[in-house]
Amino acid sequence: MKKIKRSAADPDPVYPFGDEVPIPLPPFLVPGGGLTTDGLSLAVQTVDPLNVTLGGVGLKIGDGLSVVDGKLTSEAKIVADPPLQQSGDTLSLSTDSSMMVLPSGQLTINNLPSISVTSSGVGLVSPNAPLQLMSNGALQLSVGGGLTVGAQGSLQISTGVGVNVNAAGVLESYPLPPLVWDYSSKSLTLDIGPGLTVVNGKLQVIGATFSNQMSRMAPAPRADLQSNSIEPLPSPPSKTSLDIAEELQNDKGVSFAFQAREEELGAFTKRTLFAYSGDGLTGPFKAPASAELSSFLTAHPKGRWLIAFPLGTGIVSVDEGILTLEISRSLPEVGSGSSSTSLKVISIYFMDLFFPVPFIDRASHPAPRRSNNSRQLFHSKQRLFLKVKDFKKRSWYSSLFTLINLNIQECPELS
């Protein structure tokens, strides 16, 4: 019997696993539209983050995501640091009134009177005086006379002679003689000497009356010395030829103010030196002086000046431009009447006298030998000295020196 050969295209009904037999799909299933076939199996085709798990389509999720009640939920939260702020699902920028957001979404600065906004940046508008804008962009205060900028950048007052700023930062005035500051009444007063008084707030000469038409002075009683008398001397007109003031400071920071004045009084020249201590002084004071003040001090015949100030009495001298003030004990004025004094030298330190003729009858008062009980009166072209035993008994001396307007001080005997 002839064996019939089976066609290779026909499936083997006994063992059909060797060949792939296409399985016809229903017309409503189209492979490639999310479905795939594997032999007799029909499967769903997925890509990440989808997958097939336990016969179902699942979603792969990472940190920050979870499924709650069948809904995908995000566990991540946005934390905004200032100036950012979060309002619901919106993140925004917090600004004040000096800044604004343009409709285009750009951040800009509101125009202020003192600020200029240009394409090159933000700058200052040119300020009004006394402020000025420097070339480096810094704002500087322009100061004038009497003001300065200290080392710490603070505005300070420049002080001169008679004016100082105390530790509390208060501006104080230290007047020069004859003006005196009364601390009890906190007022400025005038220090007046013999022959002057204040009446109804006005300075007046004792014994003088004035009117609009003329002025007259009541004559003072004559002062007699035995058989000699002193006639009143005329008061020559004065002319100030020099008046300087300087504030000196030593290496310890102690300040002293000196005022030098030179007046032409007829036949003689009056040179006066005033000193004021802005700080306490317990020892010698040394500080450089200007050439003008040094020249004035060296004009003294002895090169030493006796001065009286609130702290006591001192001797002023100058050597190679260095002014030295030596403090001595406080001494009363001559003629104060406090007590009888021992032998002293009364020296007119502030005067250069030029008397054309002797004004004392020396024949009636010859100069004896020097002794503790002697009285000696002599004068020279530059200095006038007077040595007395008891000043109170010779009141005519005081009248004489008051008459010629001399400043007399009592000091220890000088060699």
Swiss-Prot record:
- What induces this protein's gene, according to its Swiss-Prot or TrEMBL record? Expressed in the late phase of the viral replicative cycle.
The UniProt similarity line reads: Belongs to the adenoviridae fiber family.
Q: What is this protein called?
A: Fiber protein
Q: Which organism is it from?
A: Snake adenovirus serotype 1 (SnAdV-1)
Instruction: Identify the keywords attached in UniProt to this record, alphabetized.
Output: Capsid protein, Host nucleus, Host-virus interaction, Late protein, Viral attachment to host cell, Virion, Virus entry into host cell
Q: What is its main location?
A: virion
Q: What else is known?
A: All late proteins expressed from the major late promoter are produced by alternative splicing and alternative polyadenylation of the same gene giving rise to non-overlapping ORFs. A leader sequence is present in the N-terminus of all these mRNAs and is recognized by the viral shutoff protein to provide expression although conventional translation via ribosome scanning from the cap has been shut off in the host cell.
Question: Record's domain comment?
Answer: The tail region anchors the fiber to penton base capsomers, whereas the shaft, built from several repeated motifs, allows the knob to protrude from the virion.
> Superkingdom of the source?
Viruses
Q: By its UniProt entry, which InterPro entries does this protein fall under?
A: Adeno_fibre, Attachment_protein_shaft_sf, Fibre_HD
Instruction: Recall the taxonomic lineage recorded for the source organism.
Output: Viruses, Varidnaviria, Bamfordvirae, Preplasmiviricota, Tectiliviricetes
Q: What does this protein do?
A: Forms spikes that protrude from each vertex of the icosahedral capsid. Interacts with host receptor to provide virion initial attachment to target cell. Fiber proteins are shed during virus entry, when virus is still at the cell surface.
Subunit annotation: Homotrimer. Interacts (via N-terminal tail region) with pentons.
Q: Where would you find this protein in the cell? A: Virion; Host nucleus
A GO biological process of this protein is: cell adhesion
Provide one Gene Ontology cellular component: viral capsid
